[in-house]
Amino acid sequence: MRIKICGITQPDQGQAIAQLGATALGFICVPQSPRYVTPDQIQGVITQLSISVDRIGVFANASLSQIEQVVQQTELTGVQLHGDESPQLCSEIKQRFNHLELIKAFRVKNLEALAQITAYFDRVDTLLLDAYHPQLLGGTGHTLNWDNLAHFNPPLPWFLAGGLTPDNIQEALTRLHPTGIDLSSGVERSPGDKDLTKVAQLLTQLQQFSSKKFP
């Protein structure tokens, strides 16, 4: 299972989280976000990494040129679109950056919103399902209605996000079967300041879950 910790801002925390067992780090490239980091800050984290992990830049309603500017200045391995990007724009971004993983995030408000995801199946590499919030794009601490996802079985890999914590991760994975999980506020002291104790607790919970599932 992929384990993505999003909203990394500090090099020492990025390195520690990778060492604890995360498989991906997310960097927020949305200037309005309290977790925003510049390309220089992103690269500052990446150069400190001694372990190979996926490095994902998170954008929301950014132009192709804005994404390109960040990609050219950093060693990202993937781009995540967390806004209202159309299937057509996703195709253009994938074509332009075909060497990078393209993740499309969806803030799922209801079953109707879930149905709209099908239009993206052949446009992106990976899906991410997050909780809906009328003002915030992510890191809300709100959980999804997991019941709505009971029959979600897309042909692509997908991350479950939205209010996940060390305390509820086992329940989430008992009820749903994502190929990855994405946490931000659930392992933070404050926006952008990760709580390494909580990250360690998360990995412990995942190990316990795995041993129960595959004794």
Swiss-Prot record:
**A Gene Ontology molecular-function term?**
phosphoribosylanthranilate isomerase activity
- Give me any GO biological process, just one: L-tryptophan biosynthetic process
List keywords of the entry alphabetically. Answer: Amino-acid biosynthesis, Aromatic amino acid biosynthesis, Isomerase, Tryptophan biosynthesis
List, alphabetically, the Pfam families matched.
PRAI
> Which EC class heads this enzyme's classification?
isomerase
> CDD domains of this UniProt entry?
PRAI
Among InterPro entries, the record links this protein to: Aldolase_TIM (IPR013785), PRAI_dom (IPR001240), RibuloseP-bd_barrel (IPR011060), TrpF_fam (IPR044643)
Its EC number(s): 5.3.1.24
Pathway it belongs to? Amino-acid biosynthesis; L-tryptophan biosynthesis; L-tryptophan from chorismate: step 3/5
Known catalytic reactions? N-(5-phospho-beta-D-ribosyl)anthranilate = 1-(2-carboxyphenylamino)-1-deoxy-D-ribulose 5-phosphate
Family indicated by similarity: Belongs to the TrpF family.
The protein depicted here goes by the name N-(5'-phosphoribosyl)anthranilate isomerase
What organism is this sequence from? Answer: Rippkaea orientalis (strain PCC 8801 / RF-1)
